[in-house]
Amino acid sequence: MIKREMLGRYRGSMMGLLWSFLNPLLMLAVYTLVFSVMFKQKWQGGSESRSEFALLVFAGLLVFNIFSECVQRAPTLIAANANYVKKVIFPLEILPWVTLGSVLLHAMASLSIWLVFHLLFIGLPPLTALLLPFALMPLVLFSMGVSWLLAAVGVYLRDISQVVGAFTTALLFVSAVFYPINALPEAYRPLLLLNPLALIIEQVRGVLFWGVPIKPLDWAAGMVLACAVAWLGFRCFQRMRKGFADVL
């Protein structure tokens, strides 16, 4: 199903799966132009390098896009696969996993672009980059929990997809994607850390770019929260799925 999802995404386009690599490449070029050239932005605590700023922003976007793609597609997920709803033996709960699998494969393509540019302009990433899968584990569980919840609610409230789109756009600017957390006044930093994505993005930048290992306590706290969200989302999905066939 993940393969079908991947192929279906670019069905009819001339370059097909090549867009998995071209999209992040174009995105990296655009953000480099806008923030580093036009607005002359520099990363606080970093060097004056434009390529460094672009790579740091791109790493944050990589994390954010995993979450945003999952949750934006979740509200219409069941309706788009209505043929599976009346199949008693089909496990509907795997549909968000299929979306996540497709999104993660695209994220791997984006990561490969990031790695190539890092090698060209900065050099080898630090050894802590090997910790990236661990840094992303809370993100995966958190995304799944929210996706299960939105997939179930989206069957009954079709307008929720419009709300989610606006919410994720706003969330982009309060998730430390375009700036480090320590760039904010100290009074506002605790508020930003209430957003789980902000901490995950900082951890990913730390292991990929700065050579900073994940703090065990921060990671454990993130995992506990992510597991709680995943459990809650799954429970809501299982309770609400009983009425899917009647609504669809």
Question: What are the language-model segments listed below?
Answer:
Residues 1-248:
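Hydrophobic transmembrane alpha-helices and immediately adjacent juxtamembrane helices
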